[in-house]
UniProtKB/Swiss-Prot annotation:
ATP binds at residues 21-28. NCBIfam families: recB (TIGR00609). This is RecBCD enzyme subunit RecB. The lineage of its organism: Bacteria, Pseudomonadati, Chlamydiota, Chlamydiia, Chlamydiales. InterPro entries: DNA_helicase_UvrD-like_C, DNA_helicase_UvrD/REP, P-loop_NTPase, PDDEXK-like_dom_sf, RecB, Restrct_endonuc-II-like, UvrD-like_ATP-bd. A helicase/nuclease that prepares dsDNA breaks (DSB) for recombinational DNA repair. Binds to DSBs and unwinds DNA via a highly rapid and processive ATP-dependent bidirectional helicase activity. Unwinds dsDNA until it encounters a Chi (crossover hotspot instigator) sequence from the 3' direction. Cuts ssDNA a few nucleotides 3' to the Chi site. The properties and activities of the enzyme are changed at Chi. The Chi-altered holoenzyme produces a long 3'-ssDNA overhang and facilitates RecA-binding to the ssDNA for homologous DNA recombination and repair. Heterotrimer of RecB, RecC and RecD. All subunits contribute to DNA-binding. Interacts with RecA.
Amino acid sequence: MSSFDIFSPTTSVSGKFFLEASAGTGKTFTIEQVILRSLLEGNVEQTKNILVVTFTNAATNELKLRIQESLKQALTLFSQALSHPETPLPPYVSSQETKVKQLYXKXRNSLATLDEMNIFTIHGLCRFTLEQHFPWVQPIHPSSMFSEPQTIQQYILDYLRQNSWENVLSPKQYAFLSYHHRATTQQTRHLADRLLQDYASTPNLALPPLSITLQKVKNWSSQYKHLSPLSLEELQDFSLRFKQSDLPIDRELPDFVKQFETDPNSLDILFFPGMVQKFQEENRNKKKLGPPFSPLDPFLKDWLLIAQPFCQKEPIFHTLLKSVQQHLKTYCAQSYSHDESIATLESLLAQNDHVVSQLRKQFQLVLIDEFQDTDKRQWKIFSKLFASPDYSGSLFLIGDPKQSIYEWRNADLPTYLQAKNSFPKESQLILDTNYRSTPQLMQALNHLFSLPSPFLETPQTILYHPLQSKGSASTSYSEFRPIHFFTTQDSQEEALWISKTASYLRSTFAIPFGNMAVLVQDYPQALKLITHSTIPMAYCKEKRIFDRTESPYLLILLLEALLYPENQQKIQAILLSRFFHLSATDIHQHLKIFSSLFFMLNTYLHQYSLLATFYKLMGETVFSQTIGETLLQTPLGDIIFQELEELCLYLDKTTENPHHKLFHLINILDTGKYDEELSFSSQSNDDNVLKITTVHSSKGLEYDVVFCSSLNKVKEKSPSVHMREMYVACTRAKKFLFIPFSSIEKRLQSNKKVSALANYANITQHDNIPHLVETLTASHPEFFSSGTQPPESNISIFSEPLPEQEFFSLPILSSQPIYSFSSTTESQYFTEPFQEISSSSLFPGGSLTGTLIHKLLESLSGNFNASLEEITHKAQTLLKNTILEGFESIISEKIYTAFSTKLPFVSGSFALKDVHPYNIRVEETFLLQENGELWQGIVDLFFEHNNRFFIIDWKTSFLGDEPSLYSPDKLLLYIQRQGLDKQGVLYKRAAKKFLHQFNSSLQIEMAFVFIRGIDDKGNGFLQPSP
């Protein structure tokens, strides 16, 4: 392959080129200069006509900054040349004054419009193209006000509100699912929340289409129509052959018989969860066999085959999830996973030549970086768009097959070679000058990697091309040669050898520890070396914040406590964590104090940032020491503290809304989608700390001294992978490369696990590693050396006290009392307290009665179309052993009346049973600031119906047994005397404040419903004036 010299006047940057860039050859610099030359020479009209595809988001940001710096330098150079014509310019630039003025104007315009340059990851390019050229994939552009998970949530809510589920679920299935995902108890989560959490999951349990299930039902009913009419008594007797189940079937059996008689071909015949559970074969009671055969046996067995999956919560949910995913793919391009976005774009481009033509015209220069990590599908997109003869612009594919070590990311070397072979030989170029390593080390590396011939076989051959060196680094090789092998028997001996040698290099050559690195295969290997090291070492592998400690989960607990300080269980959860490290006894004794702290922090969070609130919390004193001190004293406490800082800062930059911070963090944990920003490195920039990192994490980095411990670690990998990882590891070094090996001679066995060094010895036809080392040091003593003992340093092991921690304080926000209608005294706020009548002939009065009925109403939320029998059953369960035991029937009748009676709201009358279960929220807590006072309240019932929002406050007050005592005028007098009119105003304001973040025009109506007096004549209902 021909050499590519970006500064040569004879080198063209116009055309299609395949550029191989070995380690240390200035690949990123070359990309910058190709872009600069293309702009200056007029091959590209504007920066918006340039497309660069890189591997990571971090790389896109770094590249844009480097391009910006190159343009600034060019601008400065041309400015100097205009003032001082003798200023030397790049060889490809004319020194004519007119030409220099033109170049100055081009560089200035390019710098001003740099933000228009298109620098993407492959997935970013796919999303950009889908949004720009396929609007039907994403008809609504995502609002900048919402993050990606918030946008997806809105699409899920639209799907549910539009009843799109009707295409895949029966009404009973959906009601069943909604009931089990009510946001009313700690054990359940809202259906929309779970759909958002799992929207990227694979719905493996999804049921077949309803049409197929319906056909199975019809076949079943036709097969057993001779059993009609079905005997309820026989079915009840047959059920005795089975053990008692958790779900009662007493009410299901009559309904099943009726359904079989009236409409056996309906899907409703399947939805009897109690029968499905009861008639499982494993529940058969062997002691009650009954007659040897019953026609109901095959009848119910065949029914179970259809009904069992139809009634199970997870298959129903997966069916809904699959439909939601299709909805998101149709209407929200953001919901595509990375692989799906690539597949979608590939498919759409294959059918849209017009879009292909537009993209070719838009991009006059295309550079694909890290091409060795490209897979077949990505290459098909690039090939169709830019490698085609119909593309008239310039294309650079830039990569190095020797550094393709990311096979788990679908990196595909055969695709790389196929793409390379599609270019003519004269367009296959190479960067053949190394700017990283010393000339001596470069020569040693050339020899080391020229021995395997070919370098790789995959099955095509890949050759190693020796590089010349123009590295600025220089050193003396008296004690060691550029590549030095040292013997070691275990991790302890290896760590001591590295410690002594690193100390010697620092004292002799003034190389800081911070410019040295130990490369390992994995964290366990790093941990062993750190444990036995006698000098400071730090593990520097890039990791997600979510991979190492529980800090994200701690932050979720903290955010929940900060956002909902009225919820004692959320407060207790954070108090039990390592933040506070308190016992249950301590929490119980001081819960009020801690609740007051979190109410104060809640206000602090809304006035300041999450990071500021975190620091405020860390400075609070609990039992003689600060919370921060308590955290730092726990295992990994210092790491957790750092990670929490990073997370708080990230969430503060993501959104200002505290609730959205919690939502965003939960979504990251659920979906695994995170920004590059959350790749957290424990790396220290301290020059007095030697770095330890993995080979994969070291790619793209360089160090003066490299200890390749990874080459001595036995791993089960293919010879090709071993070879590529060895190349990446060795080419990180600028001056010295040290490779450990075991001196025990063992004949290599290629069919077993081996180290990368043993694999190399095998490929180069050596008996074992000692034989390899002996051959290299004997044949080329100027490049290779070996030894057993480390050199002695002239100075003692470095030791320096840690710097004293600096702290800063934030202003202390004074606490403020929080009022509620249940905690304020009547005499303080209301001059004429209303005396409630205490004697009732229906059921007892008092606050305990109100609490119990509210609990009953809460348990029935989302099920307002429940029958009287269902309500009574629930009441009997909840009111057992309470003061209301024995009054279940009358209370159930009152509640049933409240659910089924049309409520005369101003906007129109309707019954609660007509409200869709999904649109109902109960026991919603709020905190509202009103005239400088903080008011806390709980909304009994908040729901949406016919595109309007409503609040209902249940009242169990006893005003008498006569219905007329609950007329609107009597109720108005009651709520005015009790101050409940102010309660209604505050509840509406709190709801409006919540809804305002979505739509400021939404209207809310609020009403009081008196359980004792509600009827169809208008009694028991009061809607206060606006």
